[in-house]
Amino acid sequence: MKISKRQQDIYEFIKSEVKEKGYPPSVREIGEAVGLASSSTVHGHLARLEGKGLIRRDPTKPRAIEILSLEDEAETPNVVNIPIIGKVTAGMPITAIENIEEYFPLPEYMAAGETNVFMLEIDGESMINAGILDGDKVIVRQQSSAINGEIVVAMTDENEATCKRFYKEANHFRLQPENDALEPIILNNVTILGKVIGLYRDIH
């Protein structure tokens, strides 16, 4: 998660005061600590910290600032905004703006250090035997080739991105679903958009 230097200073000051004194500082004390004379400016920074989930405030109480990650003293993991693709425009780069439906804030470690990644939301149950369920978001590293048996995202003749297991065979390509009730997709040509390297699932 990216925050400004001033917001980081404010966050660290609040955290140290809570740890040392057992209660948070006042807005005036925060301003004095980080060199801000205007209380409204301090309030603005606090609002942004709250919006990023780092603190929680009670507007009815002057000192009610709760640090949300104080329990484990762990740093908030960096977040990267990963494009979620939908319908793919032929001839365009996979992450071209025409293909992107939205951006998803993913903890950086889940991208496995890769920078050229995108996500695809799974629609249907074609990959359930591989543990990929309807509504899951697969994390995909962009690449144009694959080894037999790898799970890839490929482009169909209808310009839809589909997640299947890849096989290159004698005179065709086979995109194999991981669902015994479904038939494979057989193609003379295939455009591989990337290899699946991870999975994100919302637990409701």
Curated annotation (Swiss-Prot):
Q: Which reaction does it catalyse?
A: Hydrolysis of Ala-|-Gly bond in repressor LexA
Q: Which residue numbers mark the site Cleavage?
A: 90-91
A Gene Ontology annotation in the biological process aspect, one of them, is: DNA replication
Per its database record, what is this protein's job? Represses a number of genes involved in the response to DNA damage (SOS response), including recA and lexA. In the presence of single-stranded DNA, RecA interacts with LexA causing an autocatalytic cleavage which disrupts the DNA-binding part of LexA, leading to derepression of the SOS regulon and eventually DNA repair.
Q: Which residues form the active site?
A: 126, 164
Q: What is its EC number?
A: 3.4.21.88
Feature: DNA-binding region: 27-47
- What CDD domains does the database record attribute to this sequence? HTH_ARSR, S24_LexA-like
Q: Any idea which UniProt keywords this protein has?
A: Autocatalytic cleavage, DNA damage, DNA repair, DNA replication, DNA-binding, Hydrolase, Repressor, SOS response, Transcription, Transcription regulation
Native organism: Listeria innocua serovar 6a (strain ATCC BAA-680 / CLIP 11262)
Assembly with partners or alone: Homodimer.
Gene Ontology MF: a single term: serine-type endopeptidase activity
Query: Does the record carry RNA-binding as a key word?
Result: no
Tell me where on the tree of life, at the top rank, the source sits: Bacteria
Full protein name: LexA repressor
Q: What is the lineage of its organism?
A: Bacteria, Bacillati, Bacillota, Bacilli, Bacillales
Give the protein family: Belongs to the peptidase S24 family.
Enzyme's top EC category: hydrolase
Is the Endoplasmic reticulum keyword given for this protein? no
